[in-house]
């Protein structure tokens, strides 16, 4: 399954807030609830599917990519759900988004694909690149002025969202630093990751 490129509001109306997908918020219309099916409850499978879709669309993954990440978690010690989120949080495109260098993860992915980003002074054009503690992320020199304007705009839009403690942003030097791997308690996503693991448990 390819990466979703359709209307983003359609997704967040169904799955609720996904800040990595879009910074905009749709206007919800009030609907009168019908009581024709008061017995209806969300099935376990549907709950797992929705959590899986939240992760997919928030981080901008294809179905194949997410499946591969779940497979990796089974080879690593620790809680599989926590490891899954940590792997996704340490992707280069997500780090750029969390630093405020891009307004959304798709926007961060575009910066990486266009070779604007350096990791430890080397150009990296792979959005899924796994960042490590002590990695230094900078913006390529010849585009600095243009991108600083974009960065400032994105930071102003997200003033209420503080940069996570595992990252440091130095706008004076136009760089970000990965201090450490993020802890689960500091991942502020409304996602039940163990339901995602459960979803794939019978499919891998």
From Swiss-Prot:
Belongs to the universal ribosomal protein uS4 family. Keywords: Chloroplast, Plastid, Ribonucleoprotein, Ribosomal protein, RNA-binding, rRNA-binding. Residues 90-150 form the S4 RNA-binding domain. One of its GO terms (cellular component) is small ribosomal subunit. NCBIfam families: PRK05327.1, rpsD_bact. It comes from the Eukaryota. It is found in: Plastid, Chloroplast. One of the primary rRNA binding proteins, it binds directly to 16S rRNA where it nucleates assembly of the body of the 30S subunit. GO terms for biological process: ribosomal small subunit biogenesis; translation. It comes from Gnetum parvifolium. One of its GO terms (molecular function) is rRNA binding. The keyword Cytoplasm does not apply. Its main location: plastid. The gene is rps4. Part of the 30S ribosomal subunit. Contacts protein S5. The interaction surface between S4 and S5 is involved in control of translational fidelity. This is Small ribosomal subunit protein uS4c.
């Amino acid at each position: 399954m390819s990466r979703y490129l359709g209307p983003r509001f359609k997704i967040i109306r169904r799955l609720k807030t996904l800040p990595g997908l879009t910074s905009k918020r749709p206007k919800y219309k009030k609907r009168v609830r019908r009581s024709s099916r008061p017995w209806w409850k969300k099935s376990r499978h549907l709950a797992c599917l929705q959590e899986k879709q939240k992760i997919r669309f928030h981080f901008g993954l294809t179905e194949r990519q997410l499946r591969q990440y779940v497979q990796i978690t089974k080879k690593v010690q620790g809680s599989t759900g926590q490891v899954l989120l940590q792997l996704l949080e340490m992707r280069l495109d997500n780090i750029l988004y969390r630093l405020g260098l891009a307004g959304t993860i798709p926007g961060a992915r575009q910066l990486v694909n266009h070779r604007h980003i350096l990791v430890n002074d080397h150009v990296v054009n792979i959005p899924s690149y796994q960042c490590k503690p002590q990695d230094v992320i900078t913006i390529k020199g010849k585009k600095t002025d243009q991108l600083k304007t974009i960065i400032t705009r994105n930071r102003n839009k997200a003033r209420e969202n503080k940069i996570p403690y595992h990252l440091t942003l130095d706008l004076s030097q136009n760089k970000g630093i990965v201090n450490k791997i993020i802890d689960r308690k500091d991942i502020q996503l409304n996602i039940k990751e163990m339901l995602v693991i459960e979803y794939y448990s019978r499919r891998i």
